[in-house]
């Protein structure tokens, strides 16, 4: 009985892992979405409003990143966001821009648009590297 239970747990763990993986189709869709976000975000307000969408895409791709890439981006993001805690626990969605409260000041807009530009470029670069490495012939 113990062996059967262990096998069932192992099978469930394997299925959950495979189902939650970041597929090539999801990567391609997110890559196209990031490119569209960057291309169509011309003014400061649009860039500020689309930061959350970039963060959502990053959160989807983060488990697939190399530890060094993930640590670098996590550090960059945490410097520009803060966790919203309720009774000491992060809410779903977890973070918000520090600058949102001051979004009307020119300095805050500069910080937010700089964050948007850097985050978007970092995510786009990761997608480019993923697709480049998957299309290069093996030696």
Swiss-Prot record:
Q: Which InterPro entries match?
A: Turandot (IPR010825)
Name the GO terms of the biological process aspect.
cellular response to heat; cellular response to UV; innate immune response; response to bacterium; response to heat; response to UV
Query: Keyword set for this entry?
Result: Immunity, Innate immunity, Secreted, Signal
Stretch forming the signal peptide: 1-21
Domain of life, source organism: Eukaryota
One GO cellular-component annotation of the UniProt record comes to:
extracellular space
**What are the subcellular locations of this protein?**
Secreted
Would the keyword Repeat turn up in this protein's UniProt record?
Answer: no
Answer yes or no on keyword Cell inner membrane. no
Protein task: A humoral factor that may play a role in stress tolerance.
Q: Which family does it belong to?
A: Belongs to the Turandot family.
Name of protein? Protein Turandot B
């Amino acid at each position: 009985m113990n062996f059967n239970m262990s096998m069932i747990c192992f099978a469930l763990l394997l299925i959950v892992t495979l189902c939650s993986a970041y597929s090539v189709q999801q990567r391609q869709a997110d890559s196209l979405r990031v490119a569209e976000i960057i291309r169509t975000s011309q003014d400061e307000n649009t860039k500020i409003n689309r930061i959350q969408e970039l963060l959502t895409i990053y959160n989807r791709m983060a488990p697939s990143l190399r530890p060094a890439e993930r640590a670098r981006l996590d550090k960059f993001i945490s410097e520009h966001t803060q966790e919203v805690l309720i009774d000491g626990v992060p809410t779903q969605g977890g973070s918000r821009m520090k600058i949102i409260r001051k979004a009307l000041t020119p300095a805050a807009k500069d910080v937010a648009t700089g964050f948007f530009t850097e985050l978007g470029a970092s995510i786009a670069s990761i997608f480019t590297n993923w697709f480049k490495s998957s299309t290069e012939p093996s030696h």
